[in-house]
Amino acid sequence: RTWLLKYPEHAITGLLSAALGKAGEAQDNARAALRMLTENGHQPLLQEIARRYNQPEVTDAVNALLALDPLDNHPTKIPTLPAFYQPSIWTRPVLKANAQSLPDSALLRLGEMLRFPQEEALYPGLLQVKAACTADSLAEFTWDLFTAWLAAGAPSKESWAFTALGVLGNDDTARKLTPLIRAWPGESQHKRATVGLDILAAIGSDIALMQLNGIAQKLKFKALQERAKEKIADIAESRKLTVAELEDRLAPDLGLDDNGSLLLDFGPRQFTVSFD
């Protein structure tokens, strides 16, 4: 991503033929990179490079690519979901509007969308699901998906069932995942634990970041602890904070006011609890 944004002309020149070529993974990756570049202000450059070919069909193909509905921006080939994907026996996502559960057909589509690459941006269809369904039911569904993946032997090619926790997870997800992250290095699963740190960061809530910071503060597996420290530093930088400032914001306030006091109200009697 950094290289593409630094050298957009070279990148577009190299990517264009693949983006307009044979359907497949190479085309999907090239188109995703071009979309990222256009979203970062390089659409005029893309159109200029297309015109250099002096071929109307190239210009037309690029214009068609730019006009593509965001919901159509998904891999050309959608593989069959794995055998462990059995959503009919899991917690079902519930609609906010009427508390109805999603039907099997919608759960099939949800599984397919969770498989789509999410590196550059979340697929718009998933944003629609998050807007339509309750956060807690989505988190429970995704946890069931994750545990099914673990029970199936955690196949690496289906790791989307793990990283989906970062897409649809919540505070409870972070609390349940953290003990596993802490234990995995001792089970020769350092790489999985590292992905777990990424998931906590992706959830991004104060509770999730508190869990991440707890790993950064204390863990017997030092390589993972250092990686957690790096994640906290990156998050602090993205928020224009120092690490100390971020940690201060993540510290639980225990219900205290700015003076470090808590008012206990028992009707006719009140007590103030203060901490030095």
What feature does the model see in each segment?
Residues 9, 24-28, 154-155, 171, ...:
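Alpha-helix N-cap/helix-start positions at coil->helix boundaries
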Residues 1, 8-19, 40-50, 136-149, ...:
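Amphipathic alpha-helical scaffolding segments comprising HEAT/armadillo-like alpha-solenoid repeats
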Residues 1-6, 28-37, 126-132, 158-169, ...:
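Structural detector for internal amphipathic alpha-helices that build alpha-solenoid repeat scaffolds
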